[in-house]
Amino acid sequence: CQNVYAENCRMDSPSLDRVLRIKTNSCRGGVIENINMRNVTVGQCKEAVLKINTDYEPREVCCRGFNPTVRNVWMENVTCQKSRYGVMVVGMPDACQVYDVDLKNCQFNGVWDRPFDRSGKSHDIYFDNFTVNGSQMLTSAPYQHWSEWLVRSEMQRVAHPYLLDFAK
């Protein structure tokens, strides 16, 4: 599945399970790429606004070993007023096949469980101006080490931070 576009949509059914769902498994394999969604307004959904699942139907009897790849998933200007999860990514346990997922200018309110739920392997998931329940979601920690946080918080706390001497 490649080059899918959904834009300028309004979804407002109480029966809506997910807004954008990508499902595959190691029986099917293949590449799912260039999935684009923008300018979408959602009233509510039952599970996740975005769900990527590369382990769909794990008990399915089949010949396994065809690891699927999900890449280049892009959501911009998507709002949702109520859901259980914000973003849910279920990657393969042994291969990193989910990557380059971007959420930009998205706002999910009324998320009552986890805003970002990830299991298995995935990488390069980016959030740019993405808020859940009014809080900004970050792709990574704002500080590399706790000492950076400590220095910054002390500099904000003290009226004249240039007088601080951390060498002692």
Model feature map: region roles:
Residues 1-168:
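Extracellular/periplasmic carbohydrate-active domains that bind, remodel
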